[in-house]
Amino acid sequence: GRGWRERPHLKLPAIALSWTLATVIFPASHLGITWWEPENAHIWGIAISQVLFVAGITVPFDVRDVNLDPSEFRTWPQRWGASSSIRIALFLLAISASGFVVFDLNWGRAAVAIAALPIVAWTVRPRKEAVYSLLLDGLLILQGSAVFWFSSIH
């Protein structure tokens, strides 16, 4: 059988939702935040913003792999081209940053989402592997670090 990464339209949401569970929902639950309670509705805003953030920084990997992925994958770059896909990724990041500003008292996530914009824009053309493995993947580590740093200055 085919794995989830080989199913059209499933790879990007699966990655974004997995990272959101690991970086928002599980930590909130671990802290005892009952994210289903109305007074904690902001957690959903943060989670949705995180899904958009992860999706936005994942699209450049599909742009990089456009000539490697089978056409059945129907990734955004295969369907709409690199430029349109990166524009969509930038839009996702902008909405993500806005959501973090509205729903998250800690500005670390918003700061990293904003910092991701020029990096993602730069990937409209193929770059060296270090751009993907260090800069884009590093944004997830930077985001966690920024959350801790911004927590310490409040």
Where do the protein language model's features map onto the residues?
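Hydrophobic alpha-helical transmembrane segments
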Residues: 33-42, 82-92, 132-135
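Transmembrane helix-loop-helix
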Residues: 1, 87-135
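Helix-coil boundary and interhelical linker segments in multi-pass alpha-helical membrane proteins
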Residues: 23-48, 98-107, 148-154
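Transmembrane alpha-helical segments that form the membrane-embedded catalytic/substrate-channel core
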Residues: 1, 21, 50-63, 118-125
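Interhelical loop and helix-boundary elements at the membrane-water interface
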Residues: 1-17, 73-86, 121-149
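Solvent-exposed interhelical
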Residues: 51-93
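Alpha-helical transmembrane segments of multi-pass integral membrane proteins
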Residues: 12-27, 46-58
